[in-house]
Amino acid sequence: MCAGGVCPGLLRRVLSCFPGNVSLSLAYGSGVLAQRGSQPGLMKYGVISTEDMLDDLLQWKTLYVSGRLHKPVRILRQQDGEGRLHNALQANLRSAITAALLTLPESFSEEQLFTTIAGLSYTGDFRMVVGEDRNKVENIVHLNLEEFRHLYAQFLHESPHVVYQPSQGRLELDKSADTQFTQLLALPTHLQQQLTNLVDPPGRNRDVEEVLLQISQDPDCGLWVRKGISTIVKRSSLSQSVKGIITAGPVKAIRYSAQKVKKMWKGFLTSRR
């Protein structure tokens, strides 16, 4: 993944590496310019401005780029003179752990935690119901378990609310209302606002902190967090799907969807065995 100030010169250099029929479209709602190569050797990538990327990493406006960066990735090049991008990437990982912990019980395994984290950006994505392998998230974690450990170990050891036992692959979590309130206050502000909109009826206009305090004392606190994330992802995934059809064209979109459905059925049949 590469981020930087998007400029015509950069785009020309990127596009010069691909065939002349490479398409370019703005993926509204995420700030990502989606690029698709042509067969053979189909390649899909995206270009995003630094400011849009920072915004999503810190605020979770779309959970599109930030959600992908909850998983282990290989950063090929990073121009970050002031350290803003590095700090935002770290904040995004910390937010992912915080959100996941709010939805988990008092005791759970490493794999449960990482599966929850990897699944955050798919929560509310309609494509996970129709068109995606049902085992997609589990497969991501299973194939990259050691990378997930490396990515999140420091945050888990630093957390005052978690007892992490790497040798046993188990974690114990303080689920008191006070701890949950502290965790809710640490969530990205856009997610906090979504939670406020869900819990507060129209016209009340209560302070965000007051609403989060109420949620922290609710036995369904984790469910509210999932609903808030789902609201963000649902809007973003619909936008991405529409723009994906425009970018690829209807014929390619149908072929791509057919491949997705095939993978979905394969995953469904595998899970039934």
Question: Language-model segments: which ranges?
Answer:
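Short glycine-biased active-site loop of nucleotidyltransferases that positions the nucleotide triphosphate
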Residues: A34-G41
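Active-site/pore-lining binding-face segments in mid-to-C-terminal subdomains
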Residues: L145, L151-N205
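Short, flexible loop/turn elements at secondary-structure junctions
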Residues: G29-V32, S121
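Charge-dense, extended regions
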Residues: T179-R273
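Conserved NTP/Mg2+-binding pocket subregion across the NTase superfamily
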Residues: L42, G46-P166
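Helical scaffold of the NTase/Pol beta-like nucleotidyltransferase catalytic core
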Residues: M1-Y28
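Polybasic/polar functional segments that serve as interface/processing modules
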Residues: S23, V32, D55, Q59, ...
